[in-house]
C-alpha cells in the first residue's frame, strides 16, 4: 500500500510541475487573463459582523499568505511575465494579495467579490466578469484577484490559495489554458 501511495505521489508531482511550466510559458508571451485566487488566509469564513469596508471584520492574509503573495510577485518578475492591469475583489485578502504581489494599487472590481447568495446576483457578477475578460485585448497580462467560489463558477477548476488559472473565452464560457502554483 505504501509503494502504491509513493508511486501515485511521484506521478502527480511531475504533472503539477509541467502544468506550472506551461502556464509560465503562456504568461511570458503576454496577452492572457489570469484568475488568481487570493493568498493563504487566517480562517475559513468571514465573521457575522462582516463589513466590506473594514478589514478588521474580515478574514485576512496570514503571515504565510503575505509571504506567498510576495513570492507570487517575485516569480512574475523573475519569469518575465508582463502585467498590464490588476483588478481585484474589494475584500481585504484579495486587495492585500494584489498589493503585496504586484507592488501597486489594484483596480477595484466589485464583480470579483465573493459570489452573492441570490442566483440573479451571481449571474450578474459572472456576466460582468465575463464581459471584462472578453473585452481584454492587451499585449501584456490581465490579473484578476478573486475567490475560490468565483473561479470555480467561471472555470470548474478549484485552485489552491495563491494559485493562478490562465483562461481565454470559449463559446459562452472560459477555457483553461494553464495553471501556475506558488
Which residues make up each language-model segment?
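Bacterial N-terminal signal peptides that target proteins for export
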Residues: 1-6
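N-terminal signal peptide c-region/cleavage motif recognized by signal peptidases
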Residues: 12-16
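Active-site-proximal alpha-helix that buttresses catalytic centers in soluble enzyme cores
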Residues: 20-111, 115-118, 127, 157-182
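Generic beta-sheet signal
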Residues: 31-33, 138-146
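...with weaker cross-activation on analogous glycine-rich loops/strands in unrelated enzymes
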Residues: 125-135
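A short, structured loop/turn motif at beta-sheet edges
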Residues: 135-140, 170
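Residues that scaffold the ATP/ADP-binding catalytic core of kinase and kinase-like folds
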Residues: 154
